[in-house]
Curated annotation (Swiss-Prot):
It comes from Anthoceros angustus. The chain crosses the membrane at residues 26-46. This is Photosystem II reaction center protein K. Residues 1-18 form a propeptide. One of the components of the core complex of photosystem II (PSII). PSII is a light-driven water:plastoquinone oxidoreductase that uses light energy to abstract electrons from H(2)O, generating O(2) and a proton gradient subsequently used for ATP formation. It consists of a core antenna complex that captures photons, and an electron transfer chain that converts photonic excitation into a charge separation. NCBIfam families: PRK02553.1. PSII is composed of 1 copy each of membrane proteins PsbA, PsbB, PsbC, PsbD, PsbE, PsbF, PsbH, PsbI, PsbJ, PsbK, PsbL, PsbM, PsbT, PsbX, PsbY, PsbZ, Psb30/Ycf12, at least 3 peripheral proteins of the oxygen-evolving complex and a large number of cofactors. It forms dimeric complexes. GO terms for biological process: photosynthesis. Belongs to the PsbK family. Keywords: Chloroplast, Membrane, Photosynthesis, Photosystem II, Plastid, Reaction center, Thylakoid, Transmembrane, Transmembrane helix. It is found in: Plastid, Chloroplast thylakoid membrane. InterPro entries: PSII_PsbK (IPR003687), PSII_PsbK_sf (IPR037270). The keyword Chloroplast applies.
Length: 55
């Protein structure tokens, strides 16, 4: 069962590294930045709490 889990993980990681189809090539820079967007929300939470003095 553990082997199957590892096999699926490798399949997922190889799919993430696939290039976009040619029709969507213009969105490639946006797609490169998209995984970072949740980090901005995480940092925004700290800025928000700092502005209200970490109540």
């Amino acid at each position: 069962m553990f082997y199957i889990h590892l096999e699926n993980t490798f399949d997922l990681s190889s799919t993430i590294l696939v290039k976009l189809p040619e029709a969507y090539a213009i969105f490639d820079p946006i797609v490169d930045v998209m995984p970072i967007i949740p980090l901005f929300f995480f940092l925004l939470a700290f800025v928000w709490q700092a502005s209200v003095s970490f109540r």
